[in-house]
Amino acid sequence: MKKDRIIKSSHYGHRPWWFRVLNRAWRSAGKAGFKPDLSKDSLIRAARKSTGLTDLGKDFMDEPLDRLLWSIREEARLHPVGAFITRQRMINLLAARLRAEEMFRKNHGILDRPLLPAWVILGLQRTGTTKLHRLLAADESNRVLLSWEAINPVPLEIRNSKLETWNLEPETRHLERETRNPKQDKRVAIAKKSENALRLMAPGFFAIHPVEHNAPEEDILLLDITFLSTTPEATMNVPSYAAWLETTDQGPAYEYMVKLLKLLQWQRPGKRWILKSPHHLEFINLIDKHFDDVHFFWTHREVTECIPSFISMAAHSRVIFSDEAADGNTIARHWIRKTGYMLRKGLEYRTNNQHKNQFTDIYYDGLVGNSAGILTGIYSLDGGMTPELLEKFSRAEKNNPMRKYGIHEYRLEDFGVRKEDILNETVDYRNFIKNRIRDISR
């Protein structure tokens, strides 16, 4: 993709010609009775068949999956390609859970070990979270979740005969070929195919948000395995599910996420986890509850810049799954309200827990203009910066420049909303920034 390619928010409804043709052909086939089955029984049956396993775990909950599937079937109005992708994604999530439960059953030592300390990057979408995440990943002692691991956190080949012989000690590189050499891991190949498919279906999406198979990825994808996650509302029109999610205890999702992180660090240890997702803004209390040693990095950017950028990103994501449901104004109003809600939840936790000294605040402009200063401030929490680390961070930044895949231009008027709509939803947050935030590099 050319670096000077311009992707505009007004172009979110555009799709490649072959994508439109495929959908038309598939719709014709659908009239003849060939449609992806999005019923729970069909999805679980397919996952069990693909893995040869049956146990989803004693803590598996039916309600989140039931509510999500109902909302998808009744509200999302998926086009045929979107329905196919969704079915395969659901089967993969269930299969990952089946494999995880088998791993836990055969290897009790996985869950007995403590979770690594964690640095958690949170903040609204488009505030520099991805940049900071990828910079910190350049420190090899940090344990990051790579995209191929996020898609398939559990090894694919877990035949019982192999499980019996795996060593429980992480220091001895306990796994067989699949995780010992990532280049030979089938999960890497699967993630590469997913990356290529996204490039074909949405050629301009990488200019908005690159999704690379071997790059750090958001750990919200681990929460997806519990079907308690905001990923669906970021990619589909599922208002009933989204509303239910806001009133539902997310504790079980974070409890299971900790299990998966322990499984992942058992496969590949590290000094600390570097986790990242805007989703966590709503649930800082749960991270504090389920993580023993955690520090939060809250990224900040002018809300009238970051929120319109994310609205454009969400709209471009939506058309991968649906034609009819890609209403820009509906998407914009949902996410303006939602981001205001996320910020209020995050501020509520901070206000009630000021004594814990858990937060470092990072401004977008400082991160973009002086990343070395920001990183030096971060590493003051861990013994200080070294010249070797600075060189690694500098190299990582050069390899991942802004606008690497093109230029993203966005305007609120493309979605029928006003700047005042954003300002009205973010009053408390903007006052907090004005009165309290100091850039750690100063």
Where are these regions (language model features)?
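Short His-Asn-centered micro-motif
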Residues: 122-124, 274-278, 364
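PAPS-dependent sulfotransferases, especially Golgi type II membrane carbohydrate sulfotransferases
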Residues: 1-102, 236-254, 261-265, 310-361, ...
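Glycine-rich phosphate-binding P-loop
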Residues: 120-140
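PAPS-dependent sulfation machinery
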Residues: 149-273
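Pre-Walker A adenine-sensing motif
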Residues: 102-112
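Post-Walker A helix-loop "phosphate-sensing" segment adjacent to the P-loop in P-loop NTPases
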Residues: 138-148
